[in-house]
Swiss-Prot record:
Family the entry assigns: Belongs to the HAD-like hydrolase superfamily. Cof family.
Protein name stated in the entry: HMP-PP phosphatase
Entry superkingdom: Bacteria
Gene field: cof
Organism expressing this protein natively: Klebsiella pneumoniae subsp. pneumoniae (strain ATCC 700721 / MGH 78578)
Active site: D8
Reactions accelerated catalytically: 4-amino-2-methyl-5-(diphosphooxymethyl)pyrimidine + H2O = 4-amino-2-methyl-5-(phosphooxymethyl)pyrimidine + phosphate + H(+)
Reported function: Catalyzes the hydrolysis of 4-amino-2-methyl-5-hydroxymethylpyrimidine pyrophosphate (HMP-PP) to 4-amino-2-methyl-5-hydroxymethylpyrimidine phosphate (HMP-P).
Keywords: Hydrolase, Magnesium, Metal-binding
Amino acid sequence: MAKLAAFDMDGTLLMPDHRLGEKTLSALKRLRERDITLTFATGRHVLEMHHVIGEFSLDAFLVTGNGTRIHSLEGEELYRQDLAPEAAEAVLHGKWDTQASMHVFNDGGWFTGQARPELLQAHVFSGFHYQLCDLKRMSAQHVTKICFCGDHDDLRRLRIQLNETLGDRAFLCFSAMDCLEVLPVGCNKGAALAVLSQHLGFTLQECMAFGDAMNDREMLGSVGRGFIMGNAMPQLKAELPHLPVIGDCRNQAVSHFLTHWLDNPDLPYSPE
């Protein structure tokens, strides 16, 4: 029996409308009744996630900003890592050949230079909102991460530009087909989960995890049992071909698997 279960949010635990389904909520509560520790491992901001777990009365550790922050059940910060200021400065003031919009995150929230109301659809359940500002006037100190949102092919070309400029000063990954993230070196959900599991006295082999995007790769590949969503990015399935693929987030597939696992732990699972 696993001691810790870690869940990505968008495309995994949440349905396509970015809401938490009733079956999923019920399955999570059953895990807690079995004394299995819950962790939400997400690219979302901790300010937003505090609202989410409060709304649903869930006791869960938080890995936020794709591994840049870890918070306890009580909201205590257990770990933090920021982008190197020179890397943040280079991104903020670079001249990038892209149509993608830039978004900057720090402990104060989410900041962008242009209104993108369509992006708020992913935050309807929490009400979390970007703050408009002149990004070139932002401090490069204490930046958690920077992300670019736009067309995937455009972002792939942008990634080449960013790699050429940043080199080994940052870690780049796709958290979705339309979102490219610039993170601190060595920062990912898997590394954060290793820190958290050690803090709790668990091994990664005693953890299970669920995800759908390339920012879940390290986490899924490092735990005892990693599960890929049926709706996952093709690149993730290709990178971790040995991991089982469950159903689609639109069908609350995580709850389907967990219900089977809790009720019939010794029987093989089929997503059908």
